[in-house]
Amino acid sequence: MKSYIFLDRICFFAHHGVGEQETLAGNEFTVSLRLQVNIAPAMQTDDVADTVSYADVYEAVKAEMEVPSKLLEHVGGRIVKRLFGDFPQIENIELKLSK
């Protein structure tokens, strides 16, 4: 059974941007995720090991947001790549990264 896990409007302070002021001073960013996963195993077992842990996803996104980048497209690409790599249960990702 496929379903979605949502992490909505997670706020981070980070140093992304093309301009010198953006990279020095930093800015607030918001990340929202919609992760498509098969929830059938977790429905049966009630075990977090059979699904995607919200806490682990948050930590992965936080780690990528801490790496300064010029372009939000680059940050978003890293987040998606990291999540697919760390969580093979994820079948699809929709990401919104806002400044």
Regions found by a protein language model. Give the residues of each.
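N-terminal, polar/charged subdomain of small-to-medium soluble alpha/beta proteins
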Residues: 1-99
